[in-house]
UniProtKB/Swiss-Prot annotation:
Pathway: Amino-acid biosynthesis; L-lysine biosynthesis via DAP pathway; (S)-tetrahydrodipicolinate from L-aspartate: step 3/4. GO terms for molecular function: 4-hydroxy-tetrahydrodipicolinate synthase activity. The record marks T43, Y106 as: Part of a proton relay during catalysis. It is found in: Cytoplasm. Catalyzes the condensation of (S)-aspartate-beta-semialdehyde [(S)-ASA] and pyruvate to 4-hydroxy-tetrahydrodipicolinate (HTPA). It is an enzyme of class 4 (lyase). This is 4-hydroxy-tetrahydrodipicolinate synthase. It catalyses: L-aspartate 4-semialdehyde + pyruvate = (2S,4S)-4-hydroxy-2,3,4,5-tetrahydrodipicolinate + H2O + H(+). The lineage of its organism: Bacteria, Pseudomonadati, Thermodesulfobacteriota, Desulfuromonadia, Geobacterales. Pyruvate binds at T44, I202. PROSITE patterns: DHDPS_1 (PS00665), DHDPS_2 (PS00666). The active site is at Y132 (proton donor/acceptor), K160 (schiff-base intermediate with substrate).
Length: 290
Protein backbone atom coordinates (compact mmCIF):
# COMPACT_ATOMS: atom_id res chain seq x y z
CA UNK A 1 0.00 0.00 0.00
CA UNK A 2 2.73 2.47 1.04
CA UNK A 3 6.38 2.15 0.00
CA UNK A 4 9.63 3.99 -0.48
CA UNK A 5 10.70 7.24 1.16
CA UNK A 6 8.05 8.65 3.48
CA UNK A 7 8.99 11.89 5.21
CA UNK A 8 7.95 12.56 8.80
CA UNK A 9 7.52 16.25 8.12
CA UNK A 10 8.27 18.94 10.72
CA UNK A 11 5.64 21.40 11.91
CA UNK A 12 7.15 24.87 11.44
CA UNK A 13 6.28 27.57 13.98
CA UNK A 14 6.41 31.36 13.89
CA UNK A 15 6.17 33.19 17.21
CA UNK A 16 4.43 30.24 18.82
CA UNK A 17 1.88 29.56 16.07
CA UNK A 18 1.90 27.00 13.27
CA UNK A 19 3.47 28.64 10.21
CA UNK A 20 1.05 27.58 7.48
CA UNK A 21 2.95 29.30 4.67
CA UNK A 22 6.22 27.53 5.49
CA UNK A 23 4.44 24.21 6.02
CA UNK A 24 2.90 24.42 2.55
CA UNK A 25 6.32 25.27 1.09
CA UNK A 26 7.86 22.25 2.84
CA UNK A 27 5.18 19.96 1.40
CA UNK A 28 5.98 21.23 -2.10
CA UNK A 29 9.73 20.86 -1.48
CA UNK A 30 9.19 17.23 -0.52
CA UNK A 31 6.99 16.34 -3.47
CA UNK A 32 9.20 18.16 -5.99
CA UNK A 33 12.18 16.12 -4.75
CA UNK A 34 10.65 12.67 -5.05
CA UNK A 35 9.21 11.88 -1.62
CA UNK A 36 6.70 9.02 -1.92
CA UNK A 37 4.38 9.98 0.97
CA UNK A 38 4.18 12.45 3.85
CA UNK A 39 3.46 11.84 7.53
CA UNK A 40 1.90 14.86 9.23
CA UNK A 41 1.94 15.13 13.04
CA UNK A 42 4.38 12.35 13.79
CA UNK A 43 7.09 12.63 16.45
CA UNK A 44 9.08 14.89 14.13
CA UNK A 45 5.96 17.04 13.68
CA UNK A 46 5.82 17.71 17.45
CA UNK A 47 2.36 16.20 17.73
CA UNK A 48 2.69 15.89 21.50
CA UNK A 49 2.76 19.68 21.93
CA UNK A 50 0.01 20.54 19.43
CA UNK A 51 -3.47 21.01 20.84
CA UNK A 52 -6.33 19.13 19.19
CA UNK A 53 -7.35 22.00 16.93
CA UNK A 54 -3.76 22.60 15.79
CA UNK A 55 -3.17 18.88 15.31
CA UNK A 56 -6.11 18.49 12.94
CA UNK A 57 -5.33 21.78 11.21
CA UNK A 58 -1.78 20.66 10.41
CA UNK A 59 -3.15 17.44 8.91
CA UNK A 60 -5.64 19.49 6.85
CA UNK A 61 -2.93 21.85 5.58
CA UNK A 62 -0.60 19.02 4.54
CA UNK A 63 -3.45 17.09 2.90
CA UNK A 64 -4.66 20.19 1.07
CA UNK A 65 -1.20 21.18 -0.16
CA UNK A 66 -0.34 17.66 -1.33
CA UNK A 67 -3.33 17.90 -3.69
CA UNK A 68 -3.36 14.15 -4.23
CA UNK A 69 0.19 14.12 -5.61
CA UNK A 70 1.39 11.78 -2.86
CA UNK A 71 -0.43 9.95 -0.05
CA UNK A 72 -0.70 11.79 3.26
CA UNK A 73 -0.56 9.78 6.48
CA UNK A 74 -1.76 11.40 9.71
CA UNK A 75 -0.21 10.79 13.10
CA UNK A 76 -3.20 10.09 15.34
CA UNK A 77 -1.65 8.10 18.18
CA UNK A 78 -2.26 8.91 21.84
CA UNK A 79 -1.75 7.35 25.25
CA UNK A 80 -5.54 7.50 25.57
CA UNK A 81 -7.29 4.93 23.40
CA UNK A 82 -10.44 7.07 23.21
CA UNK A 83 -8.39 10.07 22.08
CA UNK A 84 -6.61 8.00 19.43
CA UNK A 85 -9.96 6.78 18.10
CA UNK A 86 -11.26 10.38 18.00
CA UNK A 87 -8.21 11.70 16.13
CA UNK A 88 -8.28 8.74 13.73
CA UNK A 89 -11.94 9.38 12.92
CA UNK A 90 -11.23 13.06 12.32
CA UNK A 91 -8.26 12.25 10.09
CA UNK A 92 -10.40 9.88 8.04
CA UNK A 93 -12.92 12.69 7.54
CA UNK A 94 -10.13 14.94 6.23
CA UNK A 95 -9.39 12.29 3.62
CA UNK A 96 -5.91 11.01 4.47
CA UNK A 97 -4.65 7.73 3.00
CA UNK A 98 -3.79 6.23 6.38
CA UNK A 99 -2.83 6.91 9.99
CA UNK A 100 0.28 6.36 12.09
CA UNK A 101 -0.38 5.23 15.67
CA UNK A 102 2.42 5.52 18.20
CA UNK A 103 2.33 3.10 21.12
CA UNK A 104 0.73 4.60 24.25
CA UNK A 105 3.46 6.45 26.14
CA UNK A 106 3.86 6.99 29.89
CA UNK A 107 1.05 4.52 30.84
CA UNK A 108 3.41 1.54 30.27
CA UNK A 109 0.70 -0.96 29.23
CA UNK A 110 1.36 -4.69 29.08
CA UNK A 111 1.51 -6.48 25.73
CA UNK A 112 -2.15 -7.40 26.25
CA UNK A 113 -2.96 -3.73 26.84
CA UNK A 114 -1.17 -2.79 23.62
CA UNK A 115 -3.04 -5.49 21.72
CA UNK A 116 -6.40 -4.30 23.06
CA UNK A 117 -5.52 -0.64 22.39
CA UNK A 118 -4.67 -1.20 18.74
CA UNK A 119 -7.54 -3.62 18.20
CA UNK A 120 -10.01 -1.06 19.59
CA UNK A 121 -8.79 1.60 17.14
CA UNK A 122 -8.75 -0.81 14.20
CA UNK A 123 -12.28 -1.99 15.04
CA UNK A 124 -13.57 1.57 15.43
CA UNK A 125 -12.24 3.22 12.26
CA UNK A 126 -11.93 1.67 8.82
CA UNK A 127 -8.75 3.25 7.49
CA UNK A 128 -5.27 1.80 6.82
CA UNK A 129 -3.37 1.92 10.11
CA UNK A 130 0.38 1.84 10.72
CA UNK A 131 1.62 0.76 14.14
CA UNK A 132 4.53 2.82 15.45
CA UNK A 133 7.02 1.27 17.86
CA UNK A 134 9.57 3.67 19.33
CA UNK A 135 10.37 2.41 22.86
CA UNK A 136 13.20 4.90 23.33
CA UNK A 137 10.57 7.64 23.51
CA UNK A 138 7.48 5.85 24.82
CA UNK A 139 8.82 3.55 27.52
CA UNK A 140 7.12 0.47 26.06
CA UNK A 141 8.22 -2.00 23.38
CA UNK A 142 5.62 -3.52 21.05
CA UNK A 143 7.03 -7.04 20.81
CA UNK A 144 7.09 -9.07 17.57
CA UNK A 145 4.64 -11.61 18.98
CA UNK A 146 2.11 -8.84 19.68
CA UNK A 147 2.61 -7.39 16.20
CA UNK A 148 1.90 -10.86 14.80
CA UNK A 149 -1.39 -10.97 16.75
CA UNK A 150 -2.38 -7.58 15.34
CA UNK A 151 -1.25 -8.27 11.78
CA UNK A 152 -4.36 -10.29 11.01
CA UNK A 153 -6.65 -7.26 11.39
CA UNK A 154 -7.72 -5.97 7.97
CA UNK A 155 -7.19 -2.32 8.95
CA UNK A 156 -3.66 -2.81 10.34
CA UNK A 157 -1.42 -2.69 7.28
CA UNK A 158 2.08 -1.79 8.47
CA UNK A 159 4.45 -1.03 11.33
CA UNK A 160 7.07 1.66 11.70
CA UNK A 161 9.85 -0.15 13.57
CA UNK A 162 11.97 2.44 15.38
CA UNK A 163 13.67 0.29 17.98
CA UNK A 164 16.95 0.67 16.10
CA UNK A 165 17.17 -3.12 16.31
CA UNK A 166 17.61 -5.01 13.06
CA UNK A 167 17.04 -8.18 15.07
CA UNK A 168 13.60 -7.09 16.30
CA UNK A 169 12.57 -5.84 12.85
CA UNK A 170 13.67 -9.16 11.35
CA UNK A 171 11.67 -11.07 13.95
CA UNK A 172 8.56 -9.05 13.05
CA UNK A 173 9.05 -9.89 9.37
CA UNK A 174 9.72 -13.56 10.14
CA UNK A 175 6.58 -13.89 12.27
CA UNK A 176 4.23 -11.82 10.12
CA UNK A 177 5.28 -12.69 6.59
CA UNK A 178 3.23 -10.70 4.09
CA UNK A 179 0.44 -9.97 6.59
CA UNK A 180 1.97 -6.61 7.48
CA UNK A 181 4.44 -4.23 5.83
CA UNK A 182 7.46 -3.07 7.82
CA UNK A 183 9.08 0.36 7.54
CA UNK A 184 12.35 1.48 9.05
CA UNK A 185 11.83 4.17 11.65
CA UNK A 186 15.55 4.93 11.77
CA UNK A 187 17.37 6.38 8.77
CA UNK A 188 20.64 4.75 9.73
CA UNK A 189 19.30 1.22 9.11
CA UNK A 190 16.98 1.76 6.14
CA UNK A 191 19.11 -0.18 3.67
CA UNK A 192 19.74 -3.21 5.92
CA UNK A 193 16.05 -3.31 6.85
CA UNK A 194 15.01 -3.20 3.20
CA UNK A 195 17.44 -6.04 2.54
CA UNK A 196 15.45 -8.03 5.12
CA UNK A 197 12.13 -7.12 3.49
CA UNK A 198 11.12 -3.67 4.75
CA UNK A 199 9.12 -1.58 2.26
CA UNK A 200 10.99 1.66 2.92
CA UNK A 201 11.53 4.28 5.59
CA UNK A 202 9.55 6.86 7.52
CA UNK A 203 12.38 9.34 7.53
CA UNK A 204 13.65 12.31 9.50
CA UNK A 205 16.61 12.94 7.18
CA UNK A 206 14.28 13.29 4.18
CA UNK A 207 13.18 16.64 5.63
CA UNK A 208 16.50 18.09 4.46
CA UNK A 209 17.62 15.53 1.83
CA UNK A 210 14.44 14.22 0.22
CA UNK A 211 16.10 13.38 -3.09
CA UNK A 212 18.91 11.33 -1.54
CA UNK A 213 16.56 9.27 0.63
CA UNK A 214 14.15 8.84 -2.28
CA UNK A 215 17.03 7.80 -4.55
CA UNK A 216 18.10 5.20 -1.98
CA UNK A 217 14.71 3.49 -1.82
CA UNK A 218 14.18 3.87 -5.59
CA UNK A 219 17.55 2.24 -6.30
CA UNK A 220 16.67 -0.64 -4.02
CA UNK A 221 13.36 -1.23 -5.79
CA UNK A 222 15.10 -0.96 -9.19
CA UNK A 223 17.46 -3.75 -8.13
CA UNK A 224 20.53 -1.48 -8.04
CA UNK A 225 21.68 -2.67 -4.65
CA UNK A 226 25.16 -1.22 -5.00
CA UNK A 227 23.76 2.29 -5.56
CA UNK A 228 21.36 1.85 -2.63
CA UNK A 229 24.20 0.61 -0.42
CA UNK A 230 26.40 3.55 -1.37
CA UNK A 231 23.62 6.07 -0.70
CA UNK A 232 23.08 4.40 2.67
CA UNK A 233 26.74 4.89 3.54
CA UNK A 234 26.84 8.39 2.06
CA UNK A 235 23.89 9.61 4.15
CA UNK A 236 24.92 7.92 7.40
CA UNK A 237 26.76 10.90 8.88
CA UNK A 238 23.96 13.40 8.23
CA UNK A 239 21.34 10.93 9.47
CA UNK A 240 23.27 10.47 12.71
CA UNK A 241 23.53 14.26 13.03
CA UNK A 242 19.73 14.46 13.12
CA UNK A 243 19.91 12.90 16.59
CA UNK A 244 22.72 14.80 18.31
CA UNK A 245 19.89 16.29 20.37
CA UNK A 246 16.26 15.25 20.75
CA UNK A 247 14.35 15.02 17.47
CA UNK A 248 13.14 17.34 15.93
CA UNK A 249 15.55 19.96 17.33
CA UNK A 250 18.44 19.08 14.96
CA UNK A 251 16.32 18.72 11.83
CA UNK A 252 14.53 22.01 12.50
CA UNK A 253 17.89 23.69 13.10
CA UNK A 254 19.11 22.23 9.80
CA UNK A 255 16.03 23.48 7.95
CA UNK A 256 16.57 26.94 9.44
CA UNK A 257 20.19 26.93 8.26
CA UNK A 258 18.86 26.06 4.79
CA UNK A 259 16.38 28.95 4.96
CA UNK A 260 13.37 26.63 4.81
CA UNK A 261 11.68 27.53 8.10
CA UNK A 262 12.32 28.72 11.63
CA UNK A 263 14.19 26.49 14.09
CA UNK A 264 11.50 27.26 16.68
CA UNK A 265 10.37 24.31 18.82
CA UNK A 266 7.85 24.18 21.64
CA UNK A 267 8.72 23.72 25.28
CA UNK A 268 9.79 21.47 26.87
CA UNK A 269 12.05 21.14 23.81
CA UNK A 270 14.69 23.85 23.74
CA UNK A 271 16.82 25.41 21.00
CA UNK A 272 19.97 23.51 20.07
CA UNK A 273 23.11 24.26 22.08
CA UNK A 274 25.71 26.44 20.38
CA UNK A 275 28.27 23.62 20.41
CA UNK A 276 25.95 21.14 18.73
CA UNK A 277 24.75 23.74 16.25
CA UNK A 278 28.36 24.33 15.20
CA UNK A 279 28.84 20.57 14.73
CA UNK A 280 25.65 20.32 12.69
CA UNK A 281 26.57 23.31 10.55
CA UNK A 282 29.97 21.77 9.76
CA UNK A 283 28.37 18.48 8.70
CA UNK A 284 25.81 20.29 6.55
CA UNK A 285 28.63 22.14 4.79
CA UNK A 286 30.26 18.78 4.04
CA UNK A 287 27.03 17.73 2.34
CA UNK A 288 26.78 21.11 0.53
CA UNK A 289 23.36 21.71 2.07
CA UNK A 290 24.42 25.22 3.08
Amino acid sequence: MFKGSIVAIVTPFNNGAVDEKKLRELVDFQIENGTDAIVACGTTGESSTLDNEEHLNVIKIVFDQAKGRVPVIAGTGSNSTAEAIHLTREAKEIGVAGVLLVTPYYNKPTQEGLYLHYTAIADAVEIPQILYNVPGRTGVNLLPETVARLAGHKNIVAIKEATGSLQQASEVMALCGDQIDVFSGDDFITFPMMACGAKGVISVTANIMPKAIGDLTDAFYAGDLEKARQLHLDTLKISNAMFIESNPVPVKTALALMGKCSDEVRLPLAPMSAANKAKLEAIMKEYKLI
